[in-house]
Design a protein with these regions (language model features):
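Phosphate/NTP-binding elements of NTP-utilizing enzymes
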Residues: 1-244
């Protein structure tokens, strides 16, 4: 029987220490020098600690309640009432009772984007990072919506740790073809560019033409198909050729 070897769950910290600091929500996002782990949790609490390529990564603590209506990842249907809204300006024109109805839904989407999301996968509570959630739930790719892949989940967890660790300059990722990396990278570019002000995010490829194709065929469609509450106010065309 196959046993995965991409990661292992380790216990480098006493459970009593984890519980004590969880109670006061003292675990800070980033590298923890005292325990030599990288915390990717943004809730102040941690749960399992993964060892990926000798990189010790502390995940968020598993919540007590996880939706168990499905046994695998499923994309949540975007409410029809919100599909009609194209920009924040349209949203402002709606009555207050409409906004009050949908604000909890929108707040939850922002929370998942920031903290990540737990779901039931073959009977197991499974965590995905906020970036991975944005890719699976809100990114449009050539076949529609991306599939959930365990290898991608680990990739995004490792990538989140690289972003969290002040010692890190990034990651080197050796990939095979047709792994979905171009779409994952495009999704991350859009995700980061739409939550950080006064920042520039570029695309590097083996040629300028290939970089432009990635922008027009992958980055722009993902951006265009974001729901209105994730779209920043922008000037110019919806489908530009060189920059958003």
């Amino acid at each position: 029987m196959y046993e995965q070897t991409l990661y292992s769950v380790i216990s480098p910290i006493k459970q009593s220490t984890i519980s004590r600091l969880n109670k006061s929500k003292k675990w800070s996002y980033g590298y923890n020098k005292e325990h030599d782990i990288v915390v990717i949790s943004k809730t102040g609490q941690i749960g399992e600690i993964y060892n990926i390529q000798n990189f010790k990564i502390a995940l968020p603590k598993q919540p007590k309640k996880i939706n168990k209506t499905t046994d695998k990842w499923t994309v949540e249907e975007y409410p029809k009432e919100l599909k009609q809204i194209k920009s924040v300006f349209d949203w402002r024109d709606y009555p207050d009772n409409f906004k009050e109805k949908w604000e909890p839904y929108i707040d939850e989407q922002f929370k998942r984007r920031e903290e990540g999301h737990w779901f039931n996968n073959r009977g197991m509570a499974t965590y995905i990072t906020g970036t991975h959630y944005m890719y699976l739930q809100w990114s449009k790719i050539d076949v529609g919506k991306p599939d959930f892949r365990e290898a991608n989940r680990l990739f995004f967890i490792f990538w989140e740790a690289c972003k969290a660790d002040v010692r890190s300059y990034g990651m080197c990722y050796l990939k095979n073809r047709r792994s979905g990396f171009s779409f994952m990278a495009s999704g991350e570019v859009v995700n980061l560019a739409t939550i950080n002000s006064d920042s520039r995010y570029g695309i590097l490829s083996k040629s300028g033409a290939d970089a432009k194709t990635m922008f027009t065929d992958k980055v722009v469609p993902i951006s265009v198909n974001y729901p209105f509450f994730f779209k920043p106010i922008q000037d110019g065309m919806d489908r530009p050729k060189t920059e958003l």
